[in-house]
UniProtKB/Swiss-Prot annotation:
Note: Found in the dissected venom (DV).
GO molecular function list: toxin activity
Localization (cell): Secreted
GO cellular component: extracellular region
Protein name, as recorded: Conotoxin qc16a
Keyword entries, A-Z: Disulfide bond, Neurotoxin, Secreted, Toxin
Protein role: Causes reversible depression symptom in mice when injected intracranially.
Tissue: Expressed by the venom duct.
Domain remark text: The cysteine framework is XVI (C-C-CC).
Length: 11
């Protein structure tokens, strides 16, 4: 899983 960090970006 990845955390949302930005407009439509995953971190």
């Amino acid at each position: 899983d990845c955390q949302p960090c930005g407009h439509n970006v995953c971190c």
